């Protein structure tokens, strides 16, 4: 090779390295942080004073890499002159620029969407897509690319189909014909991204088509807001992580990031920070802080300081967040929630780069399936790490099936094959009830309409409250109870399975009893939860022991994050299923030595699920309220 050619190759290599470095270089090491401006607020930015003042407030408190400018919402389109002016302003601040569309006609009217059976409204949607593609090389459809109307035109177009069938076909076609196709004719380079909201288990009823849309859209985005679990949607904290993983598995490589708004911040700063943190634990490449005006307007309030902050040692530290700090040579006094986001994401960034790829207990949810809605998020909150897939996941030692799996007409055969390979299948009582006849060829178990009120788990402890469970019936000596409950069970007259096991071929089938109110899973006593966690830890290689509302996030490089969602500190045990010398805090370097415990080796039958397996290693840790720890072994 000549010196000249060598120099050329070296120059090209250096250029590529520089381009790669520039592409990932930003305010954060492991992800991008972005925000989004609604169309009406973009229009207000025609006023330069407003534009400059809001930017000063937001940018002084949170580091941003990108901003999305919305062109349409509620039948309003931002004028071209204003859009170009605002775009130029943010480009001058060093931000990447993307676009956005919200296909609503009136949010105040129960999020009224466009009527896709009406030709004139279809033309409006097409025009908005074309208009947006003129200005941006990527744009996001915010949340509302579904249909919630049952007007006379939609009723006539539906015909004899169910609403779900009609809407799934209607919106899959509308995405191709009215959004992606027209946009790419205007701008062949444009990437059109569909952002899905957080209510994934109900998507199909409104026309969100997770089977087809992620194929032809250039990317997707994930709503990770869980807000206040007591509000209308009743979503559990864990969903902020779980939904990212589910969408990653639907369209590997196409999930652009998460999306969190200010919802839940009235509960405490911690509730907002947790949503951001959990989103990033799923190793997503970007997060959108929705929206820009919330970052400007939602003021810091002393009521956002939770009582548990007094104990100290928390991962999210209110007093530090609201203290004055230095930025670009100036002293900044925090005034809005933007500061909460900045501190949380910079702290999380320190941890994310040390983690591998997320892993968990594979749970099969077929496309457009219903039943035991959002249950996996409750299971995540009792320490079972979830990893949801739209297809059956081969090569797993264990598979979790909820009632949703009944939608697959081949589900019984898939269960048989998993068991014949020596794997485990864990089914819920919801699936058992839905599949009584087909499952009879595998196990003769029955779950009907009979209920029981329980609060006593025998030697595994008692619940602080009574709750209702479905009764599972089985043949003695054909299936075996691993965890039982009654009222009372100790010295009582009856008991019912909470975790039941049966064998088939080389494998084992478990039935996990789900209470009528999923929230009562949090009332299972810690020793009972420990048995359940251990029985379902084969693919993860580790589990936790302790109360509910503590989640485990494992990764494929022998790291994990343990997070406490309780309002009080908790004492926990981290159990690694193999022998290891120590457990280390990934951020501080502190090491934990194995606990000195009598190793109870698993015995025969039911006893194999209690104590610790031969070779397992146990570590004791304490986690403050609403805090997390990154660990490696």
Language-model features: where?
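A conserved amphipathic helix/loop scaffold
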Residues: 377, 386, 402-633
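Bacterial N-terminal signal peptides
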Residues: 11-20
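Short, acidic/polar
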Residues: 43-61, 119-132, 202-213, 268-279
């Amino acid at each position: 090779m000549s010196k000249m050619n060598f120099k050329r190759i070296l120059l090209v290599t250096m250029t590529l390295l520089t381009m790669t470095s520039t592409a990932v270089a930003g305010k954060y090491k492991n992800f991008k942080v972005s925000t989004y401006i609604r169309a009406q607020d973009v229009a207000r930015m025609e006023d330069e004073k407003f534009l400059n003042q809001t930017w000063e407030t937001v940018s002084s408190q949170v580091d941003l890499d990108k901003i999305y400018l919305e062109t349409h919402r509620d039948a309003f389109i931002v004028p071209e002159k204003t859009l170009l002016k605002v775009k130029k302003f943010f480009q001058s601040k060093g931000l990447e620029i993307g676009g956005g569309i919200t296909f609503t006609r009136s949010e105040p009217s129960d999020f009224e969407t466009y009527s896709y059976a009406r030709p004139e409204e279809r033309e409006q949607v097409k025009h908005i897509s074309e208009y947006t593609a003129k200005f941006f090389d990527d744009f996001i459809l915010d949340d509302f690319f579904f249909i919630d109307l049952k007007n006379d035109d939609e009723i006539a177009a539906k015909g004899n189909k169910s609403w779900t069938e009609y809407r799934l076909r209607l919106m899959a076609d509308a995405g191709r014909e009215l959004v992606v196709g027209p946009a790419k004719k205007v701008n062949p380079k444009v990437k059109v991204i569909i952002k899905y909201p957080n209510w994934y288990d109900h998507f199909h009823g409104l026309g969100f088509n997770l089977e087809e849309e992620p194929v032809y859209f250039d990317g997707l985005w994930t709503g990770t807001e869980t807000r206040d679990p007591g509000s209308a949607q009743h979503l559990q904290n864990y969903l902020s992580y779980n939904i990212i993983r589910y969408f990653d598995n639907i369209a590997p490589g196409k999930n652009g990031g998460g999306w969190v708004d200010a919802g839940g911040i009235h509960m405490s700063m911690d509730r907002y920070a947790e949503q951001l943190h959990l989103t990033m634990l799923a190793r997503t490449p970007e997060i959108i802080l929705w929206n820009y005006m919330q970052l400007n307007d939602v003021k810091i309030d002393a009521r956002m300081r939770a009582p548990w902050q007094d104990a100290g040692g928390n991962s999210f530290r209110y007093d530090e967040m609201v203290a004055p700090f230095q930025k670009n040579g100036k002293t900044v006094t925090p005034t809005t929630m933007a500061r909460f986001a900045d501190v949380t994401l910079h702290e999380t960034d320190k941890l994310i780069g040390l983690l591998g790829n997320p892993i968990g207990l594979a749970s099969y949810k077929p496309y457009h399936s219903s039943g035991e809605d959002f249950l996996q998020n409750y299971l995540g909150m009792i320490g079972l790490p979830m990893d949801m897939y739209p297809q059956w996941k081969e090569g797993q030692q264990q598979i979790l099936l909820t009632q949703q799996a009944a939608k697959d007409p081949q589900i019984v055969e898939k269960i048989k094959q998993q068991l014949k390979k020596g794997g485990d299948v864990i089914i819920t009582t919801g699936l058992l009830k839905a599949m009584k006849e087909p499952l009879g060829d595998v196990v003769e178990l029955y779950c009907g309409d009979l209920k029981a009120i329980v609060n006593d788990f025998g030697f595994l402890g008692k619940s602080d409250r009574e709750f209702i469970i479905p009764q599972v019936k089985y043949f003695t000596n054909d299936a075996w109870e691993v965890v039982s409950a009654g009222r009372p069970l100790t010295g009582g007259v009856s008991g019912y399975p909470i975790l039941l096991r049966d064998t088939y071929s080389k494998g084992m089938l478990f039935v996990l009893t789900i209470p009528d109110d999923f929230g009562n899973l949090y009332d299972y006593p810690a020793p009972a939860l420990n048995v359940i966690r251990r029985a379902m830890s084969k693919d993860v290689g580790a589990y936790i022991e302790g109360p509910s509302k503590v989640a485990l996030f494992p990764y494929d490089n022998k790291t994990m994050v343990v997070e406490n969602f309780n309002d009080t500190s908790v004492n926990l045990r981290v159990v690694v299923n193999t022998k290891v010398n120590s457990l280390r805090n990934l951020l501080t370097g502190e090491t934990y030595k194995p606990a000195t415990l009598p190793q109870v080796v698993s015995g025969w039958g039911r006893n194999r699920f209690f104590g610790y397996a031969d070779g397992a290693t146990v570590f004791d840790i304490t986690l403050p309220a609403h805090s997390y720890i990154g660990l490696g072994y």
